[in-house]
Amino acid sequence: LLFLNHEFGKVAVMARGAKKTRNRFRSVSQPFVHGIFLYYKGRGMSTLNQGDVLHSFPDIRQHIVRMSYAAYMAELLEKTVEEREKNPYLFELFLTLLEQMEFGHDPEVLTSIFETKMTLQAGIQPELTKCVCCGQTDQIVSFSVKEAGFLCKRCTDQDPYAIHLHPKTSHLLRLFLHIDVQR
């Protein structure tokens, strides 16, 4: 199993027999379980000794679309967070977005918020207030991955691979970067 821990970051543990139907670890080894885990850290992989479910997010697991978006967010975490790297912000962000998703909020919007906030955690902060080339704040028409930010109408030719944006999209990207997910 791989779980994200508030205190120790990403932790890989072995849960012996978790796939068996009558095993005590069956319920805590399901996807997206928020719980309390007790594990033994040996020389190799840690071993799960005990686990209690706090919340299992059944509404996410029962809807394929929600499950897909939640799995995508979990995979982003798995790929970007180093083993045993403490990051309480990402733990709280992921948990909060799972809760919001279970309450019925749009999983696509929640995932976009997660992706935007993950760029900051990865050390990449795109320029979302003005054109990265000339500094103009009006007529933002595209986003350049190469330049890591918005391009105005005049500078959009600087990057032939720039992604053209609807005016509302640039506003949403700014909002996603700064929004408090608790709201």
Predicted regions and their residues:
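Non-catalytic alpha-helical scaffolds and adjoining flexible linkers that form interface surfaces
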Residues: 1-183
